Amino acid sequence: MGTKWTEEQELAINTRKCNLLVAAAAGSGKTAVLVERIIKMITEGENPVDIDKLLVVTFTNAAASEMRERIGDAISKALEKDPSSKVLQRQLALLNRASITTMHSFCLEVIKNNFHLIDLDPGFRIGDQTECELIKQDILADLFEDMYAKDDECFKDLVEAYGGSKSDDNLNSIILKFYNFIMSGPWPEAWLKDKVEEFNINSIEELEGKKWIEVLKESIILDLNNAYSMLTQARDIAEMGGGLEPYLVNINPEIIQVEELKIALSEGIVKFYNNLMGASFGRLKSVRKASVDDERALEKTKSLRDESKKIIENLRDNVFETSLEEAVLGMKKMYPLMKCLSGLVIEFSNRYRDKKREKDILDFNDLEHLCLEILIDKDEEGNIKPSQVALEFKDRFEEVLVDEYQDSNTIQETIVGMVSRRDIENPNVFMVGDVKQSIYKFRQANPELFLEKYINYREFEDSNRKIMLYKNFRSREEIINGVNYIFKTLMSNTVGELEYDEKEALNLGASYGELNEENVEKEYIDEIENLKVAGDIELNILNKAGNKDYSDEDELGEEEEDLDSIQLEARIIGKKINELMNPEDGSHYMVFDKDLGKYRKIKYKDIVILLRATKNWAETFVDELGTYGIPVYADTGTGYFQTIEIRTILALLHIIDNPMQDIYILSALRSPIFSFTSEEFADLRLLNKDKYFFEIIKEVVDGIYDESISKDLKGKCKYFLDYLNKWREKAAYMPIDEFIWFLYSDTSYYGYVGTMPNGVQRQANLRILFQRAKQYESTSFKGLFNFINFINKLKKSSGDMGSAKILGENENVVRIMSIHKSKGLEFPVVILGGTGKQFNKMDLREDILLHETLGIGTNCIDIKKRIKYDTLQKHAIKKKCELEVLSEEMRILYVAFTRAKEKLIITGAVSDLEKSCENWCKASASSEDNRINPGNVLKGKSYLDWIGMALTKHKDGDAIRNIGNGDITLNLDDKSNWSFKSWDRSELLETNNNKKEKNNIDIFESNNWIESKKDIKEVIEIRDRLGFKYKYIESCNTPSNISVTELKRAHQEEEFMQESYNIIDNESNEENKKEKIKRKPRFMEERQEEFSAAKKGTITHFVMQHIDLDKVTYIDEIREEVLKMVKKELLTEEEGKVVNVFKIQKFFKSDLGQRMLSSYKSGKKVYRELPFITEIPSSIIEKNLDPKIYGEEKVRLQGIIDAFFKEEDGYVLLDYKTDYVKEGEEENFINKYKIQINLYKDTLNKILGEEVKEAYLYSFYLEKELKI
């Protein structure tokens, strides 16, 4: 019995003689439809098409192989039914010749068959990516050397503007960025020259009609609509009475003002700018709370009005930070620099092309561009037309079928146009894909190509037709309903680039059947009532502020967290997995197995954890889930170069190339190959402290130090030197791959690592290094030195490689993967983790932004004045790129949701759940109908923000609305079911380590294995050893070095414990100690869109340290000082923007600030940010120490004193604080820092040799001084 196709699928399979776009949603069976269409074309009808007359373009090689295999299987099955069919026999014979291929492979075939047309050596090869990167670096170095030799002024200005302070690396990166970007288009040089000319502008009038101006207008109208919506909502609330009528005096004119701005914008950017500069929001009329019926209505009205005011002010102060005249002058000023830069990019491109021709190599960009060169000609007027080769392809291919069309880029689109009849008679292009799953912008995928056809093609018979497949055959109804709810609420033309409405919604196509005795595994037939399937979509939120007395998010940010939120979230996931695998109520969670045709108990391999990015997350998840006894595998793509076996071999290669490298020689000697000990290293170093280890080893072997070292050590040194000399000789003539395998064999290291834990994996890693060496041997580089450079470049360009993959598809483990890698796959249970992670907008902060349609967005840089600011064009491009980034994030979220077949669990973390829920409710309340308006969706900083906003409108969102005090109209028609749980930190502090230890003790104490008195004696001895307690255990808990902050925190924890419990003995104190997990250093963390309170505090301290005390009287002076720090690159632009100059001025106007300035102006020195190290008695840290034993023991204390200054009668100490402080809680605040300030006083007393007369805290939050 054949497959039962839906009506829409039948149309997609059978429709001919047109350009056909098939919009196939997730799980709609598009691959099956595509295969069936091909099968019918080559086997049915009066004149079946030979399969080699079809061009089938897939996105990956794996997809091409699968397609070929499925077509082959279908033909073979048909032949079984009709063995005599000549048509089927012919198609099977032609299958290997069929063009079922990726675009790159097709281009390669075109080039190989037509190399003579482009003067290409037929012996060319595809260059290794790292080899090509090395060639690029060499070319850049030569190019810059030549440019410096020319002493070109424009080039020097370009270096000054973009080169960086210490090297040209930044400008190198910009050139490579331009090159890689333009090569994704069909006409790179023409595009670049055209976009540079956009800077050659002479008047304001020329702005109108520019594409980027139109985009800027679209962005502005979005902001104006948002402001208008908020003001009208504020007006509606105020008009309801209740004492809010005075607000209408402001709000009604402001509504008119926004309407006038919208009209002005429609008349042109100049008119709008003039109106915007005249726009103002007056002081809101005061309303006494006592006269208001509903205080919440008052706050909501004020909030809506304030938000709309901020939108207008942002347009005026940030987007139009310069006048239109200055904007035009700025672009004109940048024209010579952009022309110089484009010239460098073109020169680099030409040199790189020539070098590749010289070496007879091509890269992947060449494949598409050279193919296009073969496929096009130009007429006498320079117009592009198909070449003879292209015309032959148009005749040859009966149809061109493009899979995953949403991921095509512009050059690929051009190639398809050249080999097909898309734009002429008898159109023949079949395109299938789903624009909602276009997630490869970083590969220059252009979803607009799909969208343009999606909008313009018709759903009925026409030369350009579209068919929509939205029946999902993958997921349960519970998943379908959840997906539809979230994306109907969030996805729009603005964010997602497509309106997700009823037409776009998924329709249920999968049939799972009821859970009953007939379709369940035999062993569970008697437990039908005790079996579970599917269930609600679950949202689990980690509240990082949970169980802490934080009344403001700033306070949370200022103090370092005790637990890393990634680890805590992993624990939530661990608990959820264990709930599925072994429910506490004794039930069993079941999934449907298609192969069995029935329900079975869930296995670990049914579960996948999806993350936006696995870096920094997957390793932590693996470690944490392991403590829950969960088998888990993560293909992180990293960690390869950090494995001990690879580090050892690379160390050997380094010293074979150059033994004068102590780090590498110590690594090699310490390895099992030579087994030197630390004591032996010390002995060698003591022989000579100035020479390299290699030189010392040679002298040892030569007998110079015979009286100073043992015979064993001399023997080891000789053994090492003999092997090293042998290897250096062989490395000089052996190919590097053969030499590496020789090393494995000669050292027996390959066999040795196989005996280590995880030995199979380690040997696989060594084989990968061998394969890498083999690839290197096929490049134009030779020798060990260049191979080491090759590996170093590989590390730098790729960051790292993943370890060798030895895991089979059927291994029973939970898999962790990125959402991108999950595309095209499906899993019974999907756990979407890390949804609280902020969107990565780092690319938007770069000096130069590039956009295929809008061109080049750069800062205006005044080299002489040393200032830079965004051009108006950059504002427009930045806004467009941000919309595209967020649209892609929306589509990535859609891909994640639609991987789930039966169960979806979502986890994420927020700093403060109450604040997050409030923000989600605000976004929802200010959005009309059942959708979140696009302006509010754009404010979301993470997937969790989006999901949270959507659920505020859902009937199951009570918990979120209650926490966020939301008064929101609900979408009561939705059928999806959601459950919500917030997790406090305290619920997750307990790890499974205690359980593991207890299990080990239970096993140990079970004496079933004791068979003799000898065994008993050994048990007692082992217990005695394990039970040994060190006599001076207290001193082990006392650090030798401690910072003031750590000491302060330790005392605060102790005080908290004493307040909570009257008496805490040692045992309970141990049980209640907070679990500490090391966090990554700040520089290793991904940069967030907004600065934390702690970071803002650090910036404030930095400004207070470096600000010129002669320039702190006026706001403008302080602003100028901050700007100087930004220009000198002491602060980044973003850091400069968060400096609160008003708060700083308030300090210097305070009594304490005036005393500091008075001291400074009288010639006395003001000390700022003074680091110190001193000694304190260890009893201050650990009060349990016996003074008789530890009385003389000292601990080093280190810290930094913010400021102190001299007055006539003594010194004044000052410490700045940026913490949040409640009014009236100053005393608690002082107590919190009293230990710290007293330690500072004692230290200064020692340093200065006289008493510090006064000590103060200055609270920037309260804007006042607090005397200690």
Swiss-Prot record:
One of its GO terms (molecular function) is ATP hydrolysis activity. Gene3D superfamilies: 1.10.274.50, 3.90.320.10, P-loop containing nucleotide triphosphate hydrolases (3.40.50.300). Residues 528-824 form the UvrD-like helicase C-terminal domain. Residues 3-476 form the UvrD-like helicase ATP-binding domain. Its EC number is 3.1.-.-, 5.6.2.4. Keywords: ATP-binding, DNA damage, DNA repair, DNA-binding, Exonuclease, Helicase, Hydrolase, Isomerase, Nuclease, Nucleotide-binding. One of its GO terms (biological process) is double-strand break repair via homologous recombination. It catalyses: Couples ATP hydrolysis with the unwinding of duplex DNA by translocating in the 3'-5' direction; ATP + H2O = ADP + phosphate + H(+). It comes from the Bacteria. ATP binds at A24, A25, A26, G27, S28, G29, K30, T31. Its cofactor is Mg(2+). One of its GO terms (cellular component) is DNA helicase complex. Heterodimer of AddA and AddB/RexB. The heterodimer acts as both an ATP-dependent DNA helicase and an ATP-dependent, dual-direction single-stranded exonuclease. Recognizes the chi site generating a DNA molecule suitable for the initiation of homologous recombination. The AddA nuclease domain is required for chi fragment generation; this subunit has the helicase and 3' -> 5' nuclease activities. Belongs to the helicase family. AddA subfamily. This is ATP-dependent helicase/nuclease subunit A. It comes from Clostridium perfringens (strain 13 / Type A). The gene is addA.
